């Protein structure tokens, strides 16, 4: 057990990763996958493939039966993970055992966190080598207990900002959030789209902060990643495009690595 914990603690924090990338004038590729999809063993290889392809940070989804912010691709991924027997204890064991040296971010919903116990969830997440939490269905005004727990255990609490987010709420998010700010490039649920919304640049300009800004909800190609990087984003977040490859089930790891390289290359070319 002590050996496992030493390996976990070597993972960099989110802020350390962004500092490293900023020195190299690179944007962060943040890849999302559902833990346990399609199986526990295969999911571990999926995470390795993303890291090998150039993912700088990996969002590790924990499935929930009512995922209000997820599009159909990620909803089905959650169903597959639940069918495999994913639960919170197995999720933390899975995260702890991952052989990757990039920051891990847990993305889930508030219901399972609340039912498990906020303090216990945050403590166990930290022990599993997780660096941050994204819980899209909890408003910043109601996240005091979660923020306290995250601060106590050295985790970043990452909030979402959408085009409809008010200036007052953005100010609160910038006061209480850390790690990076998750900017929603389009309204609605997650999913790959044919183009990146024109409101992305305007949204970036509204969020005045030294906290890194990452744009998600609709990016699936290197060209789109370059567009977002040119608009001023510190990172791009890609989920559905990766999860769709997993769902298709053909040459999964090779295709994931290839797409990650394409996305990372797009951002590098935008410098």
Curated annotation (Swiss-Prot):
* Residues of the active site: 59, 70
Q: What is its EC number?
A: 4.2.1.20
> Can you quote a single GO CC term?
cytosol
Which pathway, per its entry? Amino-acid biosynthesis; L-tryptophan biosynthesis; L-tryptophan from chorismate: step 5/5
Task: Tell me the first and last residues of the signal peptide.
Answer: none
GO terms assigned for molecular function: tryptophan synthase activity
Pfam families from the UniProt entry: Trp_syntA (PF00290)
Which catalytic reaction applies to this protein? (1S,2R)-1-C-(indol-3-yl)glycerol 3-phosphate + L-serine = D-glyceraldehyde 3-phosphate + L-tryptophan + H2O
Q: Does the keyword Transmembrane apply?
A: no
InterPro entries in the record: Aldolase_TIM (IPR013785), RibuloseP-bd_barrel (IPR011060), Trp_synthase_alpha_AS (IPR018204), Trp_synthase_suA (IPR002028)
Give the record's keywords alphabetically. Amino-acid biosynthesis, Aromatic amino acid biosynthesis, Lyase, Tryptophan biosynthesis
Q: Which Gene3D superfamilies match?
A: Aldolase class I (3.20.20.70)
State the family it belongs to: Belongs to the TrpA family.
Q: How does it assemble?
A: Tetramer of two alpha and two beta chains.
Q: What does this protein do?
A: The alpha subunit is responsible for the aldol cleavage of indoleglycerol phosphate to indole and glyceraldehyde 3-phosphate.
Report the protein name in the record: Tryptophan synthase alpha chain
Species source reads Methanosarcina mazei (strain ATCC BAA-159 / DSM 3647 / Goe1 / Go1 / JCM 11833 / OCM 88) (Methanosarcina frisia)
The encoding gene is: trpA
């Amino acid at each position: 057990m002590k050996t496992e914990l030493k390996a976990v603690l070597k993972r960099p924090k989110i802020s350390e990763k962004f500092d490293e990338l900023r020195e190299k004038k690179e944007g962060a590729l943040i890849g999302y996958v559902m833990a346990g999809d399609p199986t526990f063993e295969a999911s571990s290889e999926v995470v390795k493939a993303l890291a090998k392809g150039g993912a700088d940070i990996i969002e590790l989804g924990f499935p929930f039966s009512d995922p209000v912010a997820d599009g159909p691709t990620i909803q089905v991924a959650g169903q597959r993970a639940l069918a495999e027997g994913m639960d919170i204890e197995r999720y933390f064991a899975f995260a702890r055992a991952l052989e990757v040296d990039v920051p891990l971010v847990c993305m889930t919903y508030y219901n399972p966190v609340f039912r498990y116990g906020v303090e216990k969830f945050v403590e166990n997440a930290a022990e599993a080598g997780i660096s941050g939490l994204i819980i899209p269905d909890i408003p910043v005004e109601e996240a005091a207990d979660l923020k306290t727990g995250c601060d106590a255990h050295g985790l970043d609490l990452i909030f979402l900002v959408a085009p409809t987010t008010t200036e007052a709420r953005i100010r609160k998010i910038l006061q209480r959030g850390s790690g990076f700010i998750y900017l929603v490039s389009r309204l609605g649920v997650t999913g790959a789209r044919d183009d990146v919304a024109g409101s992305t640049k305007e949204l970036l300009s509204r969020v005045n902060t030294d906290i890194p800004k990452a744009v998600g909800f609709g990016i699936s190609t290197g060209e789109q990643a370059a567009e977002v990087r040119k608009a001023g984003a510190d990172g791009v977040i890609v989920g559905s495009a990766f999860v769709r490859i997993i769902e298709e089930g053909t040459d999964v790891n090779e295709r994931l690595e290839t797409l990650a390289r394409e996305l990372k290359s797009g951002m590098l070319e935008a410098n």
